[in-house]
Amino acid sequence: MKEYKVYLERARSRQQDFLYPLLFREYIYGLAYSHNLNRSIFLENVGYDNKYSLLIVKRLITRMYQQNHLIISANDSNKNRFWGYNKNLDSQIISEGFAIVVEIPFLRQLSSSLEEAEILQSYKNLRSIHSIFPFLEDKFTYLNYVSDIRIPYPIHLEILVQILRYWVKDAPFFHLLRLFLYNFCNWNSFITTRKWISTFSKSNPRLFLFLHNFYVCEYESIFVFLRTKSSHLRFKSFSVFFERIFFYAKREHLEKVFYKDFSYPLTFFKDLNIHYVRYQGKCILASKNAPFWMNKWKHYFIHLWQCFFDVWSQPRMININPLSEHSFQLLGYFLNVRLNRSVVRSQMLQNTFLIEIVIQNLDIIVPIIPLIRSLANAKFCNILGEPISKPVWADSSDFDIIDRFLRICRNLSHYYNGSSKKKSLYRIKYILRLSCIKTLACKHKSTVRAFLKRSGSEELLQEFFTEEEEILSLIFPRDSSTLQRLHRNRIWYLDILFSNDLVHDE
């Protein structure tokens, strides 16, 4: 019990005070503006950079000093005159600064933990999203069951505020957070709609990503705690950690829930072969043990979401499937375990018998249908996968057109080169290659046959065939047999920090 008290005291020591005064500092908005100039490719342009200036910020801070109307309740936001004439611009600027401020204590916590563990340099080297696939190849081939779980989001925004309140202790700070959230949804509603999530994520993507990541991090911290302490964690200690905010109000309910499902006082089991992977809004839970243990973890997840986050999750929405019979999607790939059966004849003295050997291999396949649908939406082909020209690029020079297609082809080839079957990847490259030729022919007002005859098809298409070979030749010796073998095998590039937008198109 003493160990868990130390854990809770350490968590409470991370609480940060006095974040609200930082909103009155000009350099905070300068950081937000600098971030917008160097905006990540994940985020869309919110379209107010041309209206942002130091003069606007100074006037805004002056109004914030003169009118202390930020410290209000969400229900009074309609009566608040603080926003002035340009409510959208003022709200946008302050929310961007708010997103910078709210990240400060957690960035300090992350950097300190990395420095203490002396893994800062290795952390930088392991940021590649491809680094997860070698792990899956090593581990998943020995597992038997997998559960593909969609992480539910809180049905009410107050839950997010309450979770964050445990880590940051600044009342005006949370009044302002409620004000921002109230501007984008109906606070009195019991359900947070997907329409609101889409609107909020586009208006302030930095703050939205922070709130979402913090919610996921909070639930995963509890899951990791349960996982590491599962061998000796009793129900009483678990309930103390589980209900950090409203423990006494919910303890009786928790006991009824858990004792209803289990006929003995709850003791966590030791499962050394469970693996957890999260990607976007989904997580994958895989184990070598029987489905009984997977069902245990399934109920733990459901009770965790319901009792701690007040999120209702249907048990039937979490399916447990044999890994050899179920394929799942991860990082733009389709993954499944293929069983290779072979029969070996063995002889012992005068007796001869056959032994069946089953070897599991992890197949990582390019999702050809979603990619063709994405290429069709981008006007590179039709829905059947037949290449078409892209007239909107016809105003560019021939070099720019070829360079654009080559860049897309190189990125897709670079990302999907870890596929176990390259046939689908070659089809995507063929679509882009022929679409490039049709675009050039459209620009020169000629047919494809006449354009290739005039310009020379071998020189034009050579770059599409050789660009990946040139990349590999920089890493491995230029040997034809070596390069051919590499083209057939999986190659995971550890410099890929994001997946292409075509991967996520639906």
Swiss-Prot record:
InterPro entries: Domain_X, Maturase_MatK, Maturase_MatK_N
GO biological process: mRNA processing; RNA splicing; tRNA processing
GO cellular component terms, semicolon-separated: chloroplast
Main location: plastid
UniProtKB keywords: Chloroplast, mRNA processing, Plastid, RNA-binding, tRNA processing
Entry's localization field: Plastid, Chloroplast
Pfam family, one: MatK_N
GO molecular function: RNA binding
Membership in a protein family: Belongs to the intron maturase 2 family. MatK subfamily.
Entries under PANTHER family matching the protein: MATURASE K (PTHR34811:SF1)
Biological function: Usually encoded in the trnK tRNA gene intron. Probably assists in splicing its own and other chloroplast group II introns.
Protein name: Maturase K
Source organism of this protein record: Lathyrus sativus (White vetchling)
Encoding gene, per UniProt annotation: matK
